A protein has these predicted regions:
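Small side chains
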Residues: 6-9, 53, 112, 135
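Intrinsic disorder/low-complexity segments
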Residues: 10, 17-20, 39, 54, ...
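Noncatalytic accessory or regulatory domains flanking protease catalytic cores in secreted, cell-surface
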Residues: 88-146
């Protein structure tokens, strides 16, 4: 009987830790920087980089953005518009922090878009930010803008 209770307790502990991980993904914090879903009506202090690219299944492409001025927020908006395809985004900051992977359902909606705000009251790290876009589940070729 006590062995069964131990197994049940272990299963509940694992399930609880999974729930905590899922909730913490919405506010990934590192070096004071917070990554969170953006409200479509919000704006940031720096205009989003707008470049186009495309990916296929299991292909990785890279984009960059240079932050040279002091800012406390930055918007990253990966848009492909086809919710039947799934892209994955990782963000690499100049201070070595890695955020992600982030998927389309990050904000609770599957809409062919990953729209994030990068926030840091002390200032977003200056330098080159790298965006890794990966074709997680793509039929054919999927175009995107970021």
């Amino acid at each position: 009987m006590s062995k069964r209770l131990g197994i049940v307790a272990l299963v509940l502990l694992v399930m609880a830790s999974c729930a905590v991980v899922s909730a913490s993904e919405l506010n990934a914090v590192d070096h004071g920087t917070i990554i969170q879903p953006a409200n479509n009506s919000e704006f940031s202090q720096i205009k989003p980089l707008t470049v186009s690219g495309s990916v296929t299944q299991s292909q990785t492409t890279w984009q960059t953005k240079v932050v040279s001025a002091y800012i406390t927020s930055m918007n990253v908006n990966l848009y492909w518009g086809n919710p039947s395809n799934s892209l994955q985004l990782r963000i690499y900051s100049p201070d070595g922090s890695i955020y992600g992977p982030v998927y389309d359902n990050y904000n609770g909606t599957i809409d062919g878009r990953i729209n994030l705000n990068v926030l840091n009251r002390a200032g977003i790290p200056k330098g080159t930010w790298y965006y890794e876009i990966y074709g997680y589940s793509v039929k054919g070729t999927q175009s995107y803008t970021i």
